[in-house]
């Protein structure tokens, strides 16, 4: 019997049921008033949870029964480009058809456009399972943020024309941001957008590179709309459709995620429409897209980690050496235990992150539809916006680095067989490698998160969790996390007092790691408080991270500039 990737992973359901999504769902369902107009809308929070549980079980069944068995063939066949036309692998085409038939291509879109109106949290759980089945498919299924961006920032006419097509699976999307000379530095984008007044029409001209699913029917394009500008203030966001003037020059021959075409595009006077306001393409709309992309890739990475870990665990039980299964050897089982605990911590962080993203989006939506937004509404949107802005890069950094480590360990546990294509371990390793690069490298996630860390944005959340009614072992573990938090706070003050840009940049990674370790320690304790069976995992996570916290603290507060002063001499060796 095939696996159900939701029913066989109790941790996803545990997070769904214990996150505290009451306010998220209530606001998204307009105090459940949508039930008057849509028969499938929930009438209460319990009804909503039951609906999410059922749809996640359906996704889990599709992943286990259909998508996962095709993954090896998809990886082998890959996408191909012939004469400018991109063709997905046969298995990818079947996967997309299955997901469309299950009405899963407009998960977050409002019901009036044919969507499920599900929160980001539930959608991310789906993307995690899809990624566990086939990481490359997530790069197609997970691009639903394209439609969500049009929903949030487009005109009603644009919503009416585009969103029902996305929800029905008739249109797919891509975000065309990166250019040959503008990778992470999107302020350097040069693709031109010019407005023809006679035709009342925008046109796009230029090149884009490394565009995931660039062969899509609908593209969101970052382009320079203001003549003579060189920075982000001259960029706007446009939507265009695939046509004869939009050429796929080639697709990249990649290490992994072969089922997802990564395209080089040439725009030759492609008709386009402005999305939102001019000049806000980078500062407002791309930042929103990137926040969504961070969450999506975190889910993708977590799915790969789950797949790699399960595969390694299965092999360790089956493979015998020296007269016993290798799972019996401490060097093997300790690796598997450590990875499992880290996956649980990463999942706790990811879904705490999506909860804050959901609340930020809910308040943003409330403000946009309010005749006169109150000061309290704006305060709530700002507060959740700040926490989401720190949590999303921390989650991406943690989940993607973890995926690479778990996939690496999976091959190690397989030994020489893990290096062979006969086993999926090497595919997980190849697929994991891109996750901490695209949609912002881990180093850029540290840059994105460090401002919030220095401002102690997450302190109220940490304080709230530190004051939960822990007893016995959990109280002792909570005290250890509290001590780690004190070290973190002193490290932040030390770096702030140095007032040295180079030192600040050098220590950003360590501060991000400390923040993540402390926050995940509290999250693991909160989970253990709800389920006593999770005490052992919380204990292992906290005992493993305490020495790392201490090490980072000692390095940061040493004030040692030798790594800066001696860098040229070391690099010259």
What name fits each language-model region?
Residues 344-396, 492-506, 525-529:
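C-terminal helix-coil-helix/basic helical segment that borders enzyme active sites and/or dimer interfaces
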Residues 1-82, 86:
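Extended, charge-enriched "interface" segments that sit outside catalytic cores
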Residues 2-39, 145, 406, 416-479, ...:
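Glycine-rich phosphate/cofactor-binding loops in nucleotide/flavin-utilizing enzymes
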Residues 60-61, 90-164, 168, 212-214, ...:
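Internal helix-loop-helix
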Residues 243-244, 254, 261-293, 310-327, ...:
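A glycine-rich, basic-preceded beta-loop-alpha segment at the flavin cofactor/substrate interface
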Residues 201, 205-246:
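A short core secondary-structure module
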Residues 384-417:
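Charged, glycine-rich active-site and insertion segments that engage polyanionic ligands
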């Amino acid at each position: 019997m095939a696996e159900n990737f939701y029913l066989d992973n109790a941790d996803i359901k545990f997070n769904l049921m214990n996150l505290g999504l009451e306010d998220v769902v209530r606001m998204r369902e307009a105090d459940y008033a949508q039930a008057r107009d849509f028969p499938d809308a929930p009438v209460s929070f319990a009804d909503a949870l039951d609906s999410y549980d059922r749809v996640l079980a359906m996704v889990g069944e599709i992943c286990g029964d259909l998508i996962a068995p095709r993954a090896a063939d998809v990886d082998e066949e890959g996408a191909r480009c012939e004469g400018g036309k991109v063709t997905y692998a046969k298995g990818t085409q079947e996967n997309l058809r299955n997901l469309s038939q299950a009405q899963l291509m407009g998960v977050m879109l409002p019901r009036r456009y044919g969507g499920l109106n599900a929160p980001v949290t539930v959608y991310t759980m789906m993307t995690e399972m899809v990624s566990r089945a086939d990481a490359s498919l997530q790069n197609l299924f997970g691009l639903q943020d394209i439609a969500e961006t049009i929903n949030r920032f487009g005109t009603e006419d644009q919503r009416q024309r585009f969103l029902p097509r996305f929800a029905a699976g008739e249109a797919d999307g891509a975000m065309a941001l990166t250019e040959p000379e503008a990778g992470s530095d999107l302020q350097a984008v040069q693709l031109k957008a010019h407005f023809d007044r006679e035709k009342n029409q925008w046109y796009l001209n230029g090149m884009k590179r490394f565009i995931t699913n660039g062969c899509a029917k609908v593209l969101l394009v970052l382009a320079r709309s203001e003549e003579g500008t060189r920075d982000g203030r001259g960029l706007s966001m446009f939507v265009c459709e695939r046509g004869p003037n939009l050429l796929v020059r080639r697709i990249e021959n990649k290490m992994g995620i072969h089922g997802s075409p990564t395209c080089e595009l040439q725009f030759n006077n492609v008709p386009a429409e402005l999305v939102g306001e001019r000049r806000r393409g980078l500062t407002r709309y791309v930042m929103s897209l990137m926040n969504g992309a961070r969450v999506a890739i975190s889910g993708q990475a977590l799915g790969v980690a789950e797949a790699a870990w399960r595969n390694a665990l299965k092999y360790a039980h089956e493979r015998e050496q020296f007269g016993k299964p290798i799972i019996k050897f401490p060097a093997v089982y300790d690796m598997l235990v450590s990875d499992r605990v880290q996956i649980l911590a990463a999942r706790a962080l990811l879904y705490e992150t999506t909860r804050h993203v959901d609340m930020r989006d809910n308040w943003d939506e409330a403000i946009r539809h309010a005749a006169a937004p109150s000061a309290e509404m704006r305060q709530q949107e700002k507060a959740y916006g700040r926490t989401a802005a720190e949590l999303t890069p921390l989650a991406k950094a943690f989940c993607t680095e973890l995926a690479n480590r778990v996939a690496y360990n999976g091959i190690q546990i397989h030994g020489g067989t893990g290096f062979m294509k006969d086993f999926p371990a090497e595919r997980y390793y190849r697929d994991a490698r891109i996750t901490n690069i695209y949609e912002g490298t881990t180093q850029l996630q540290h840059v994105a998160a460090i401002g919030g860390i220095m401002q102690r944005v997450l302190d109220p959340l940490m304080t709230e969790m530190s004051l939960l009614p822990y007893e016995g072992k959990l109280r002792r573990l909570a005290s250890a996390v509290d001590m780690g938090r004190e070290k973190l706070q002193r490290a932040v003050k030390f770096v702030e007092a140095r007032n040295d840009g180079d030192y600040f940049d050098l220590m950003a990674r360590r501060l991000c790691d400390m923040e993540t370790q402390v926050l995940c320690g509290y999250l693991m304790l909160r989970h253990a408080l709800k389920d006593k069976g999770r005490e052992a995992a919380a204990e292992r996570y906290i005992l493993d991270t305490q020495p790392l916290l201490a090490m980072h603290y000692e390095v940061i507060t040493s004030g040692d500039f030798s790594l800066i002063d001696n860098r040229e001499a070391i690099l010259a060796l």
